[in-house]
Amino acid sequence: MASHTADADAKPDSDSQKLLNVLPVSLRLRTRPWWFPIQEVSNPLVLYMEAWVAERVIGTDQAEISEIEWMCQALLTVDSVNSGNLAEITIFGQPSAQTRMKNILLNMAAWHKENELQRAVKVKEVEEFLKIRASSILSKLSKKGLKLAGFPLPLEGRETQMES
């Protein structure tokens, strides 16, 4: 019994501690879920997606993966490729689950791209509106000879003031 107590109180071996310090820390270290059969790990489906789209679909720090996995009964791994510009998504599971997962991810990616495009168009429209509005306000002020604090008069307004 004394030997068991001594083993429990002993410090860890320095070689094993060095080995643990050398190993890279992965964000996705985990055990296989109880519902996922081990045979399904052998034939993964791999797809590539732009990194910003993958981040929106899967969430920052891959927060949505467990919910997506449970919903489709397939496992996902996401790795950064091409210096962070692409995301490699590996899908493990039955072929039907892989196809379902791929379709869901691609549809979500298409939705996010379309949403981003619509947002960019709206921003462009707002910028154009503000430019037009600001120029009309400045032209009205220059006609009246007024000046907004911090805003110089338009070029034609300066010339008329210098001549008089």
Curated annotation (Swiss-Prot):
Pfam families: MOEP19. InterPro entries: KH_dom_type_1_sf, KHDC1, MOEP19_KH-like. Residues 44-105 form the KH domain. It is found in: Cytoplasm; Nucleus. Keywords: Cytoplasm, Nucleus. Its main location: cytoplasm. The keyword Metal-binding does not apply. One of its GO terms (cellular component) is protein-containing complex. One of its GO terms (biological process) is protein-containing complex assembly. Expressed in ovaries, where it is restricted to growing oocytes, with greatest levels in fully grown oocytes. GO terms for molecular function: RNA binding; structural constituent of cytoplasmic lattice. It comes from the Eukaryota. Disruption phenotype: Embryonic death at 2.5 dpc. Progression from embryonic 1- to 2-cell stage delayed 6-8 hours. Less than 20% of the embryos progress beyond 2-cell stage. Embryos form unequal sized blastomeres due to smaller, dysmorphic, and displaced mitotic spindles resulting in asymmetric division. Decrease in thickness of subcortical F-actin in zygotes, thickening of F-actin bundles in the cytoplasm and loss of F-actin cytoplasmic lattices. Decrease in CFL1/Cofilin-1 expression in the subcortex and diffused distribution in the cytoplasm of zygotes. The keyword Hydrolase does not apply. Contains an atypical KH domain with amino acid changes at critical sites, suggesting that it may not bind RNA. Component of the subcortical maternal complex (SCMC), at least composed of NLRP5, KHDC3, OOEP, and TLE6. Within the complex, interacts with NLRP5, KHDC3 and TLE6. The SCMC may facilitate translocation of its components between the nuclear and cytoplasmic compartments. As part of the SCMC interacts with the SCMC-associated protein NLRP4F. Forms a scaffold complex with KHDC3/FILIA, and interacts with BLM and TRIM25 at DNA replication forks. Belongs to the KHDC1 family. This is Oocyte-expressed protein homolog. It comes from Mus musculus. The lineage of its organism: Eukaryota, Metazoa, Chordata, Craniata, Vertebrata. The gene is Ooep.
